[in-house]
Amino acid sequence: MLIKQFSRRPKNMKVQILLAFAALFVLAVGSYASESKKLDLRDASFSAMFSADYQLNPQERGCRYFLGECKKTSECCEHLACHDKHKWCAWDWTIGK
C-alpha cells in the first residue's frame, strides 16, 4: 500500500508541473500579444499624426507647415527646413520676418 502511494505521487506531481508550465506559457503568449497590439496602435497613431497633411494640397497653401511632409527645403514655409532623416518640415532655428 505504501509503495502504491509513492508510485502515484510522481505521476500526479508531473501532471501538476506540466499544468503549471502550460499556464505560464499561456500567460506569456497572452502578455506578448497584448503588448504587440499596444505597440501597433501607438505606431499607427504616430504615423497618422504626421501624415495628416496629405489632405491639404500644397499648391493651395503655397508651402508646407511645421511637421508637414517634404522632399526639399524649398517646399517648407519660412523659417522651416526639410529634415534629412524624417522628411518633414522642422524649425531651422531662425527668427524674424
From Swiss-Prot:
Q: Which PROSITE patterns match?
A: HWTX_1
Question: What Gene Ontology cellular-component terms does the record carry?
Answer: extracellular region
Specify one Pfam family.
Toxin_12
Where does this protein reside within or beyond the cell?
Secreted
**Where is it chiefly localized?**
secreted
Q: Which domain of life is it from?
A: Eukaryota
Q: In which tissues is it expressed?
A: Expressed by the venom gland.
InterPro entries annotated for this entry?
Huwentoxin-1, Huwentoxin_CS1
Q: Which residues form the propeptide?
A: 34-61
Provide the disulphide bond pattern: C63-C77, C70-C82, C76-C89
Q: Which GO terms label this protein's molecular function in UniProt?
A: ion channel inhibitor activity; toxin activity
Q: What keywords were assigned to this record?
A: Disulfide bond, Ion channel impairing toxin, Knottin, Secreted, Signal, Toxin
Q: Where is the signal peptide?
A: 1-33
Family statement: Belongs to the neurotoxin 10 (Hwtx-1) family. 12 (Hntx-12) subfamily.
Functional note: Ion channel inhibitor.
Query: What is said about the domains?
Result: The presence of a 'disulfide through disulfide knot' structurally defines this protein as a knottin.
Protein name as annotated: U6-theraphotoxin-Hhn1a 2
